[in-house]
Amino acid sequence: MLDPNHLFDITVIGGGPVGMFAAYYAGMRKADVQIIESLPELGGQVATLYPEKEIFDVAGFKGITGAQLTANLAEQLAVFEPTTQLETSVKAILPQEDGTYILETSKGTTHTRGVIVAVGNGAFTPRKLAVDYQPEWENNYIHYFAKEMAQFKDQTVAVAGGGDSAIDWALMLEKVAKQVYIIHRRDQFRGLESSVDALMNSSIQIKTPFLIDGLTEVDHQLALSLNKMKSTDQEQLVVDKLLVNYGFISDTRILRDWGLTLDHHQVSVNQQMATNLPNVYAIGDIATYPGKVKLIASGFGEAPVAVTELLTKLYPEKRQPLHSTSIM
């Protein structure tokens, strides 16, 4: 429950991996910190959408699933027991005369000296197929998320998309499905070179450059009508499941309502991760600056920068930061 009379040092808005690590590091620095997360659990998009998908850009791990990463971060975070508000959305960030902020949320107000925005891609919805289909086919034949690999076991599966996520899903599905196809409208894939190499050397059947332009149900399976780009050639592919990876449409309008300066729907920050608002910082995928690389690994590096800079502003008289080996 929110306590409107308690003054936190730092409020982290967003409980994804980067927000969780920011709260942990703030705890290391003896800050009074809380996390506000709109979802029912911590972990953000990684935990909600991709619990069984392996992540390859976290230092120290050859590969780690979203669920494993979230569990590790939760165990780490528990060391300092930060206040955590789940299923709570921030509606407004209101500056006060004394330099603090009142946050209006869906569950009341909370008071904080500083804010770290770590909301990932904001509210997101999957970019859907641009063809008509029966609504009941969704989550039966057609999937936009793949939370459990077991549902694809021994199935014929098509993956639509040509980026990192589509390639990664296809490679994971190859381990459990009877047959995997990947359908992309371009000849070239847009994934990491190592992932594309793995795809080319796999048993996955590649359908390029094709676009799905029709769907029909045939004997409890899904028939895909494939149109070859810049051609009248057509193919039909019959599958048990279709996993669509066309990316997500993000809604970051609330950030502008908070008074933050945006650049192409992301929060503009300087090299200290500071926004245009005093004592408000942004990290992770929502933050942008020249040379930004949108990886979890980048966000993990941005978190200590934001925490350190914020605490320096709040408590300039305190000794600034020690190595973890000196304080743990």
From Swiss-Prot:
InterPro entries: FAD/NAD-bd_sf, FAD/NAD-binding_dom, Fd--NADP_Rdtase_type_2, Ferredoxin-NADP_redctase_2. Binds 1 FAD per subunit. Its cofactor is FAD. GO terms for molecular function: ferredoxin-NADP+ reductase activity; flavin adenine dinucleotide binding; NADP binding. Its EC number is 1.18.1.2. FAD binds at residues 37, 45, 50, 90, 124, 285, 325. Keywords: FAD, Flavoprotein, NADP, Oxidoreductase. It holds the Pfam family Pyr_redox_2. Disulfide bonds: none annotated. It is an enzyme of class 1 (oxidoreductase). It catalyses: 2 reduced [2Fe-2S]-[ferredoxin] + NADP(+) + H(+) = 2 oxidized [2Fe-2S]-[ferredoxin] + NADPH. The keyword Transferase does not apply. Belongs to the ferredoxin--NADP reductase type 2 family. Homodimer. This is Ferredoxin--NADP reductase 2. It comes from Latilactobacillus sakei subsp. sakei (strain 23K).
